[in-house]
């Protein structure tokens, strides 16, 4: 696969994470640039690892992985998105205490995994092509880091405009991403 095809693949793979990061940036109250970089790194590393896992598993059990990856992604995104929607409707007198809870490492990792399961499926497909999987995975990870960092900063400016609705919208975006993943695999 040539470099332009690799870049197109990488940025296409980062779109789910980009959309989720806009929602995350909007929910947080004035996230700093280092928060955006940290989130970008988490998403980027996970997005780089999942095609490697998929590539390795592609030699052993591709039919089983491809049968279930979309259901796992859908379920994780539905749960995370549903949680955000419910939290968005709760009255919260002190928004500062919500910031830490909504930006926990566990939640970031879980969201990153959910949005990167399609990259694992791509990795399975790449196992049957003549590609340098390590190079491709690194490009996917870097593209995701850039897009997530950018998404967080865009969300930072959208959040104050939307207020508490940002969390509801962010949750709906995650649910929408999950539904889209399910639709693409079942449709």
Curated annotation (Swiss-Prot):
HAMAP family: MntP_pump (MF_01521)
Main location: membrane
Transmembrane segments annotated in the record for this chain: 3-23, 41-61, 62-82, 107-129, 143-163, 166-186
Record family assignment: Belongs to the MntP (TC 9.B.29) family.
Compartments where found: Cell inner membrane
Topology in membrane: Multi-pass membrane protein
Physiological role: Probably functions as a manganese efflux pump.
Any one annotated GO CC term: plasma membrane
Name of the protein in its database record: Putative manganese efflux pump MntP
Keywords: Cell inner membrane, Cell membrane, Ion transport, Manganese, Membrane, Transmembrane, Transmembrane helix, Transport
GO MF assignments: manganese ion transmembrane transporter activity
Species, as recorded: Pectobacterium atrosepticum (strain SCRI 1043 / ATCC BAA-672) (Erwinia carotovora subsp. atroseptica)
Any Pfam family: Mntp
């Amino acid at each position: 696969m040539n470099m332009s095809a690799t870049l197109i693949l990488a940025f296409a793979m980062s779109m789910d994470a980009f959309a989720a990061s806009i929602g995350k940036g909007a929910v947080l109250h004035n996230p700093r640039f280092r928060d955006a970089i940290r989130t970008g790194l988490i998403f980027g590393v996970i997005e780089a690892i999942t095609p490697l896992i998929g590539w390795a598993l592609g030699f052993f059990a591709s039919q089983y992985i491809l049968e279930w990856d979309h259901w796992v992604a859908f379920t994780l995104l539905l749960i995370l998105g549903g949680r955000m929607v419910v939290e968005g409707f709760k009255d919260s007198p002190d928004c500062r205490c919500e910031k830490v809870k909504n930006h926990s490492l566990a939640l970031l990792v879980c969201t990153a995994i959910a949005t990167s399961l399609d990259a694992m499926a791509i990795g399975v497909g790449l196992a049957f092509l003549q590609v340098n999987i390590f190079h491709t995975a690194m490009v996917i990870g870097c593209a995701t880091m850039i897009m997530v960092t950018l998404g967080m900063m865009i969300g930072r400016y959208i959040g104050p405009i939307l207020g508490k609705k940002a969390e509801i919208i962010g949750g709906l975006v995650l649910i929408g991403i999950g539904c889209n993943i399910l639709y693409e695999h079942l449709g």
